[in-house]
Swiss-Prot record:
Cofactor(s) needed: Zn(2+)
Keyword terms of this UniProt record: Cytoplasm, Metal-binding, NAD, Nucleus, Repressor, Transcription, Transcription regulation, Transferase, Zinc
UniProt name for this protein: NAD-dependent protein deacetylase hst2
Chemical reaction(s) catalysed: N(6)-acetyl-L-lysyl-[protein] + NAD(+) + H2O = 2''-O-acetyl-ADP-D-ribose + nicotinamide + L-lysyl-[protein]
One Pfam assignment: SIR2
Organism: Schizosaccharomyces pombe (strain 972 / ATCC 24843)
Active site per database record: H138 (proton acceptor)
One GO CC term, this protein: rDNA heterochromatin
Length: 332
């Protein structure tokens, strides 16, 4: 439960405390736990805002209820609303924020135990957080599979369908393909449960950023860390049970602003900016290539379209080995 007794939080003082713990080497294994609040600065709308939220923008589909877009039984009947949403959330349209790159910087400095994210936008990956350091608790667009035969689908094929606002179908059984995003009633990825106990036991700081901690079991993560672990919340408002432990640190405000202030105290500002500049240049080149690919695929589709085909593209040509893929998985 969120504490209603929090009257005043001295965020500046608390930022200095966090910076001191890191600079003095008292914190060496940081578990970062993030939510939608770190991606709104990238332009990705949240789900429930009255005027601009994703659910509000899906009203034109006359959904029986807003969350039906993530309901598997409804998806089987009408997958189009989900793929309209998927089109809006395609990573090509967005760039990682300062907070995403801060997480990458923690990894580069060997301070990141793991990043647990509720977000499905893959911006952590685009910022360069490697797969081995990332737990996408609610899944992502990184992988897709058929909901009937469970055959994995080619990422490029699914991406091309989404870009053209088409519903991808399985090449083997013609069943519906769904990105491996956790829908209502589905369990979280096994990887979440396999790592959460170990990570929460060994981490010496639980850094929670941009989440109201309302969705379980993700919301349990900061609650199960041992009392000796320093818990830090960076969010616009109090969340979860923060404030119940004597050592809890709450830094209230905009995520990016507070993260940049923390980097300044740590002396990391130049490194963060350099990391962003380098990454933005690379991403721009990659997304430019993907835009060309999408046009080629669309033209090929129009030329080869078969009236009996259930797919928007009759064939996705084999990619050259040196072609850049947007959703990169670090296998090192």
């Amino acid at each position: 439960m969120v504490k209603n007794t929090v009257k005043h939080v001295d965020s500046s003082k608390h930022l200095e405390k966090v910076a001191s713990l890191i600079k003095e080497g008292k914190v060496k294994k940081i578990c970062v736990m993030v939510g939608a609040g770190i991606s709104t600065a990238a332009g990705i709308p949240d789900f429930r805002s009255p005027e601009t939220g994703i659910y509000n923008n899906l009203q034109r589909f006359n959904l029986p209820y807003a969350e039906a877009v993530f309901d598997l039984s409804y998806f089987r009947k009408n997958p189009r609303p989900f793929y309209e949403l998927a089109h809006e959330l395609m990573p090509e349209k967005y760039r990682p924020t300062y907070t995403h790159y801060f997480i990458r910087l923690l990894h580069d400095k060997r301070l990141l135990q793991k990043c647990y994210t509720q977000n499905i936008d893959t911006l952590e990956r685009l910022a360069g957080v490697p797969d081995k350091a990332l737990i996408e608790a609610h899944g992502s667009f990184q992988y897709s599979r058929c909901i009937e035969c469970y055959e994995m689908a080619e990422t490029e094929y699914v991406r091309a369908c989404i870009m053209q606002k088409q519903v991808p179908k399985c090449n083997s059984c013609k069943g519906l393909i769904k990105p491996m995003i956790v829908f209502y009633g589905e369990g979280l990825p096994m990887r979440f449960f396999e790592h959460m106990e170990k990570d929460t036991k060994v981490c010496d700081m639980a850094l929670v950023i941009g989440t109201s901690l309302l969705v379980h079991p993700f919301a349990d993560l900061p609650e199960i860390v041992p009392n000796k672990c320093q818990r830090v919340l960076i969010n616009r408002e109090p969340a979860g049970d923060f404030g119940e432990r004597k050592k809890d640190i709450m830094i209230l405000g905009d995520c990016d602003s507070q993260v940049r202030a923390l980097c300044k105290l740590l002396g990391w500002s130049d490194e963060l900016e350099k990391l962003i500049d380098t990454s933005v240049e690379t991403l721009t080149e990659e997304i430019s290539l993907l835009s060309v690919d999408s046009t080629i695929e669309k033209n090929a589709s129009e030329q080869k379209k078969d009236d009996n085909s259930v797919n928007p593209f009759t064939k996705i040509e084999e990619k050259k080995k040196d072609e850049v893929t947007l959703l990169v998985s670090d296998d090192e």
